[in-house]
Amino acid sequence: MEINHPDQLSVEHPTPPGDSSSLNQNGPGKQDGERCSTSGQAPEQEGSLHPEKGAHDVAEELSRQLEDIISTYGSAASPRGKESTSETKEQPPNTEAPDNEDVDYEETTEEIDREPTAPEEPAAAKEPVSNKEQKLEKKILKGLGKEANLLMQNLNKLQAPEEKLDFLFKKYTELLDEHRTEQKKLKLLLKQQAQTQREKDQLQSEHNRAVLARSKLESLCRELQRHNKTLKEETLQRAREEEEKRKEITSHFQTTLTDIQTQIEQQSERNMKLCQENTELAEKLKSIIDQYELREEHLDKIFKHRELQQKLVDAKLEEAQELMQEAEERHRREKEYLLNQAAEWKLQAKVLKEQETVLQAQLTLYSGRFEEFQSTLTKSNEVFATFKQEMDKTTKKMKKLEKDTATWKARFENCNKALLDMIEEKALRAKEYECFVMKIQRLENLCRALQEERKELYKKIREAKMSEKEDQVQRTSEEEPEPSVSENEEVDAEEANSFQKAVENLATAFTILHHPEFTPDQPTERQLAVNGPQSGSDVTHQHPETARLNHPSLPADSGSPRPPVGAQAVAEGVCEATPAPTASCTPAEAELQSQGLPAENTPGPKPHKPEANTSGQAPLSPAQGSLSVVEAKYDISPSPESEGDSAVVPGCESREQPPPEVTDIPVGPSTGLPREPDACLNGVD
């Protein structure tokens, strides 16, 4: 079992370098993929104008960062290869060292083997033969196993004790050899274990580097994704431009199609002419081949005739040899004649052979031309078939593109309609905003006018107080009535308190509260709590669009400024605090009744007309209502121009009448104002 372990370790030993190489290769693989993506984006960027040069510079910076990562983290494999080569060089001296150690170990084991041999001889001579000892031996043999059983069987077969000792000695030597070999293997395995631990440490360091490289690569990937998003936006812009180009290309493509069709017709006519010429050439070739066959038959006949002539000549020669003595002269003449004829026939044969070679060359030329013509025909047919396929594909693509253009046109028209609606809504909201701005300006002018009036009234009050004090001093010096002084002081205190309350109401009316805008998701109860019960009742009975026009306190979708809610709360609080003599109680009447003043200027209650709500006339803002209440409270004398117009409170006026403008309020001095000490005026300022 122990022998198999070194084999397994030796098999597993070379695997870690491969793993490290794979780990090292994972990083460059990703980097190559990213380079491919950047290189794939590069040709798109080359065709763009000057704004796209920045994107190209970003891609170059990312590629530089990738190269830096490769140079830092990819160079980890090179020192490892050097270490492996150095370890392989160091192995031969290490392998020689265990041999010397084994020699020393063998000497020590031989000395140990010599010592037990001496006591074994007397032990073998004094073996007991009792049953108990045999049972013990059997138990021991069972514990040792099959090898011990085999040893005992072999020993029992041997009878002489010397033979048994020799057998045991041989077995012992074999076991020693096995033990030594196992120790050698153990040392080698220990060395391999040390090497594997070193490699493991190297792999861990490389893994850490790979993790760092991976984190950097992930950051680079994120940057690339951002860059790709920008490129996508640019490509969308390009696509819009390319749609216009595509229309031009389609027109150009149609013109090219017409040209191609004309060229195809011309080529078909040329092909017909070439087919006719090919048929003519084929007929000519057939005629030439027939002539060549006739010539070959003629030559065969000539050769046969020559052979017959040669046979006759041979016969004649034999006869001439017999008659040689008789006709030597005739024989010579005939011989010369025959030699001349043979020379002539040879010349004719050479000429015929040359003609045969020439005809064969012509045949090869004609056959090659015919094959070339057939190849050109096949190529032209293939080109025509491919062209038809491409035409079919282009027609399909054109149909798809036409469908896409129709869908995009429909979307474009819908978008234009939505834009027109939005523009109209924007114009309406702008008009509303201008109206609110005008109202705010009027209120500011009114506030300034009231402040100027207040200053003048304060001056007059001070003068009146000074004159009254002087009169009182003179009267007290003359008559000195104590109860009248106390009564005057009480009246002054009551008047001061009422004036202070009026000033506080004015301050609350002109305070601008910045409330959060209401969203459609918020409940109506909160809107009613802020806008008051009157606005809530009007909104419930009216259409939402008319409610927005008639009640500016309602939240608008366009985010237009709303009037402050504090003025409404003040007016409503006054109405609730005082007992209502009639069903239609106004804030002005409530304030006047609470102070004990008659409400002469306020008109009687008028029925509420819901038809006027839809007429488009906006009611007064809460600030204007509070100002009208102040006018009614202090009986501001109107100017001669506005004597016919009575002071109207927004809660009691009819919807059909237009709201009073700022110019209707008089700026002149008023009568019947209460007396106020100077201490209350500083707080209001």
From Swiss-Prot:
This is Beta-taxilin. Binds to the C-terminal coiled coil region of syntaxin family members STX1A, STX3A and STX4A. Has a preference for STX1A. Disulfide bonds: none annotated. Belongs to the taxilin family. InterPro entries: Taxilin_fam. PANTHER family: BETA-TAXILIN (PTHR16127:SF10), TAXILIN (PTHR16127). Residues 47-67, 80-90, 465-478 have a biased composition (Basic and acidic residues). Specifically expressed in skeletal muscle. The modification Phosphoserine is found at S477, S484, S486. Residues 575-591 have a biased composition (Low complexity). Keywords: Coiled coil, Phosphoprotein. Promotes motor nerve regeneration. May be involved in intracellular vesicle traffic. One of its GO terms (cellular component) is cytoplasm. The lineage of its organism: Eukaryota, Metazoa, Chordata, Craniata, Vertebrata. One of its GO terms (molecular function) is syntaxin binding. Residues 1-135, 465-497, 517-685 are annotated as: Disordered. Pfam families: Taxilin. It comes from Mus musculus (Mouse).
